[in-house]
């Protein structure tokens, strides 16, 4: 059994990272899940949320937006729509987006077409604020 996982994260725009890591935690569509070396093969979907990985005693966080995770032979491939590391999140912009989404949601009902889009925008903003607020490595 390998002692490390090879983590690869890719968006449509770029390769976000390639790292040898000790474990990952991801926001699965059915709930948060973790992967350690020797994990059973897996293919699952991701939702908007906080993705983390640990290298030694350091934990790194990213805000991810929808995607897929494939685990096979101590390799974790993450394909996501967007992924932002802590140091690439503009906290003021994320807070402004949160305010806009909250204000717009107060004007809408669940029957409105835009309602679910605004809920998703709210969730993305909240995750970005959470990840940015980590204040460096965990």
From Swiss-Prot:
Gene Ontology cellular-component annotations: plasma membrane; proton-transporting ATP synthase complex
The keyword Phosphoprotein appears for this protein: no
Compartments, as annotated in UniProt: Cell inner membrane
Tagged with keyword Nucleotide-binding: no
Keywords assigned: ATP synthesis, Cell inner membrane, Cell membrane, CF(1), Hydrogen ion transport, Ion transport, Membrane, Transport
Membrane topology, as annotated: Peripheral membrane protein
Xref: InterPro entries: ATP_synth_F1_dsu/esu, ATP_synth_F1_dsu/esu_N, ATP_synth_F1_esu_C, ATPsynth_dsu/esu_N
GO molecular function: ATP binding; proton-transporting ATP synthase activity, rotational mechanism
Major localization listed first in the record, in broad terms: membrane
Pfam families hit by this protein: ATP-synt_DE (PF00401), ATP-synt_DE_N (PF02823)
Known partners and oligomeric status: F-type ATPases have 2 components, CF(1) - the catalytic core - and CF(0) - the membrane proton channel. CF(1) has five subunits: alpha(3), beta(3), gamma(1), delta(1), epsilon(1). CF(0) has three main subunits: a, b and c.
Role of this protein: Produces ATP from ADP in the presence of a proton gradient across the membrane.
Family assignment from sequence similarity: Belongs to the ATPase epsilon chain family.
Name assigned to this protein: ATP synthase epsilon chain 1
Gene encoding the protein: atpC1
């Amino acid at each position: 059994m390998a002692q490390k996982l090879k983590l690869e994260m890719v968006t449509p725009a770029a390769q976000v990272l390639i790292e040898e890591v000790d474990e990952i935690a991801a926001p699965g569509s059915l709930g948060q899940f973790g992967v350690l070396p020797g994990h059973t093969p897996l293919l699952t979907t991701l939702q908007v949320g906080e993705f983390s990985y640990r290298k030694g005693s350091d934990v790194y966080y990213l805000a991810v937006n929808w995607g897929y995770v494939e685990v096979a032979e101590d390799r974790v491939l993450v394909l996501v729509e967007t992924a932002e590391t802590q140091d690439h999140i503009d906290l003021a912009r994320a807070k402004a987006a949160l305010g806009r989404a909250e204000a717009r949601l107060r004007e809408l009902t669940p029957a409105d077409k835009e309602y679910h889009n605004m809920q998703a925008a709210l969730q993305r903003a909240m995750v970005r604020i959470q990840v940015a607020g980590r204040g460096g490595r965990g």
